[in-house]
Swiss-Prot record:
UniProt-recorded Gene Ontology molecular function terms: mitochondrial ribosome binding; ribosome binding
UniProtKB keywords: Membrane, Mitochondrion, Mitochondrion inner membrane, Transit peptide
Gene Ontology BP, a term: positive regulation of mitochondrial translation
Highest rank taxon of the organism: Eukaryota
Protein name, UniProt field: Inner membrane mitoribosome receptor MBA1, mitochondrial
Miscellaneous comment: Present with 2720 molecules/cell in log phase SD medium.
Gene name of the encoded protein: MBA1
A Pfam cross-reference name: MBA1
One Gene Ontology CC term in the entry: mitochondrial inner membrane
Transmembrane domains' residue ranges: none
Task of the protein: Mitochondrial inner membrane-associated mitoribosome receptor that spatially aligns the mitoribosome exit tunnel with the membrane insertion machinery and allows cotranslational protein membrane insertion.
Length: 278
């Protein structure tokens, strides 16, 4: 009897076993979930570290409203002018909505004045460095698509001449014409695509090293330059350039679902010194 009693002491009640198994199962599940959570965080962190914003270019068509001076005569083409004005108002409203959505979803207050000043600074640095053939100085300021195009054009510059580029003045206040939030997979909403209109008077000075002859060319230039803006760091990367839409152009779709078309468009828009389409 004493042996049986002592033996029974080694067997806990059934309810205690069930309780113990539940606790063990719960702790094991929690450990697995914690490990999975840590693995997911590490993967997300590695994705963020692998992301390079310089890989992004202008992939989608962007509607740039025609300047008032480029609209046809309202009496000769009233419908075209009316549609152009409607699209201009629609674009203005869409930009306002995009800004509001970005601010709501990201919780970041846009710093438009700072971004405009940094865009101007980047624009000047890129043009100056290209004229001086110092593309290494602006490597972090431009996308890979722009860098590739600048390197190709730099090889076409005359070897026996030195160039200097100067921004004489702005003919009009730089204007933000397009705002589009950029969603990057695996990352919070932090980036914007901003397109600025720069109406400038520029000077290009060319000096022939053999004859020492100097040529000076002054001209008015209107550029529509796209930038990738990191709203958390205020860093600006020049993504490419665009051209003003024609008065009878329709609104394009806001995204490009064909990868080949998107890549081709990023390459074309990366050449900021290309001529406008005829």
């Amino acid at each position: 009897m004493s042996v049986l009693r002592s033996t029974c002491l080694f067997f806990p009640p059934r309810s205690l076993l069930i309780s113990f198994n539940k606790r063990r199962l719960f702790s094991t599940s929690r450990l697995i979930l914690n490990k999975e959570s840590e693995t997911t965080k590490k993967k997300d962190k590695s994705k963020q570290q692998d992301f390079n914003p310089r890989h992004l270019g202008v992939a989608a068509e962007i509607f740039i409203p025609s300047a008032y001076k480029n609209l046809p005569n309202v009496f000769a083409h009233p419908l075209i002018v009316a549609n152009a004005l409607i699209r201009r108002l629609y674009t203005f409203g869409l930009n306002s909505v995009q800004v509001a959505l970005f601010r709501f979803q990201s919780g970041i207050k846009p710093s438009f004045l700072l971004w405009k000043n940094k865009a101007i600074e980047t624009y000047i640095n890129v043009n100056t460095s290209f004229a001086h053939k110092n593309l290494s100085d602006i490597k972090g300021l431009v996308s890979l698509w722009v860098q590739e195009a600048l390197e190709a054009r730099s090889r076409q510059l005359p070897g026996n001449a030195t160039l200097d580029w100067q921004l004489i003045k702005f003919n009009a206040v730089p204007k933000l014409v397009s705002v589009q939030p950029i969603m990057i997979p695996g990352m919070p909403l932090e980036h914007l695509q901003l397109v600025y209109k720069f109406d400038t008077k520029q000077r290009l000075i060319k000096v022939n090293q053999q004859t020492k002859k100097t040529e000076t060319l002054d001209r008015d230039v209107v550029d529509y330059i796209a930038f990738l803006c990191d709203a958390t760091t205020n860093d600006m990367i020049l993504m490419g350039s665009l051209f003003e839409s024609k008065p009878n152009d329709k609104l394009p779709k806001s995204y490009e679902d064909d990868a080949k078309v998107a890549i081709h468009r990023m390459k074309v828009n990366g050449d900021i010194y290309r001529l406008p389409p005829s």
